[in-house]
């Protein structure tokens, strides 16, 4: 019994590897509002408490105003909850989340937050970094489309090529992927939505997330996302490259998400299913 319990705990820590980062924030706010946003880390679209041991991985959330001004949000409430220091001035903002580069290595006993040198008989190592972004508009004016189509400068970034507030189900929505400031060609981009995930919650929360779209970027890093139904869409790209020093780690892996509301999402999420990992 004891042995099994230890094994399952190690498996759990490995499974946590499959968590991802996205930004949970309102799309619109009334003038004079304080922004409340959530640094989501887990299984989309369920926002949960970040495990204590992982808190150090995350940088504080940031917002970037359409005029280029950047502010760091304050962590207040649960460890994933952030808000602006004061009421935001009118205009459009990017809200960003960052999971700092972190080594994860695996051996027969599971995953550990370390590089190859820190584990006995390691089989795999990845230096993981994750980014998420979402748009919010404060006040009565529409989303600032020019700002929405401008890069923030994340190491791996999904950039809209059209006004996101005009995204419609059944119509292509073009985006461009940048990795270290260069268009990323030939990479797979996937997308799903809250309205898709609820159709198979067991898979969604069991690290087998059903996708509503998959496509590959062209030579300019562009791809047309085709959201077939209304919902809060999460567009995602993963890019892996060999780590500079193979004695330390094999892969450098970047993960990035963009939240794209298309029509209306779910008014309420069903409870997240309990998972029993054996």
From Swiss-Prot:
Range of residues in the leader sequence: 1-18
Protein name: Uncharacterized protein HI_1427
Organism: Haemophilus influenzae (strain ATCC 51907 / DSM 11121 / KW20 / Rd)
Record's keyword terms, sorted: Signal
InterPro entries to which the protein is assigned, alphabetical: DUF4198
């Amino acid at each position: 019994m004891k042995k099994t319990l230890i094994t399952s705990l190690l498996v759990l820590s490995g499974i946590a590897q499959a968590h991802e980062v996205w930004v949970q924030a309102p799309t619109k706010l009334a003038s004079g509002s304080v922004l409340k946003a959530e640094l989501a880390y887990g299984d989309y679209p369920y926002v949960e408490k970040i495990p204590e041991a992982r808190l150090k991985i995350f940088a504080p959330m940031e917002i970037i105003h359409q005029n280029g001004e950047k502010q760091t949000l304050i962590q207040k409430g649960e460890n994933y909850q952030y808000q602006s220091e004061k009421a935001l001035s009118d205009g459009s903002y990017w809200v960003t989340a960052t999971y700092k580069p972190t080594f994860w290595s695996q051996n027969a006993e599971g995953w550990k937050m370390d590089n190859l040198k820190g584990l006995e008989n390691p089989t795999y190592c990845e230096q993981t970094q994750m980014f998420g972004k979402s748009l919010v508009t404060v006040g009565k004016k529409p989303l600032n489309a020019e700002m929405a189509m401008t890069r923030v400068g994340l190491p791996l970034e999904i950039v809209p090529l059209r006004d996101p507030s005009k995204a419609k189900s059944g119509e292509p929505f073009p985006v461009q992927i940048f990795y270290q400031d260069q268009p990323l060609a030939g990479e797979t981009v996937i997308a799903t939505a809250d309205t898709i995930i609820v159709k198979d919650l067991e898979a969604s929360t069991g690290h087998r997330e059903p996708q509503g779209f998959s496509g590959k970027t062209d030579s300019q890093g562009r791809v047309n996302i085709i959201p077939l139904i209304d919902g809060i869409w999460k567009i995602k790209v993963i890019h892996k490259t060999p780590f500079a020093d193979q004695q330390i780690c094999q892969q450098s892996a970047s993960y990035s998400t963009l939240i794209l509301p298309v029509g209306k999402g779910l008014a309420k999420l069903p409870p997240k299913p309990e998972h029993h990992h054996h």
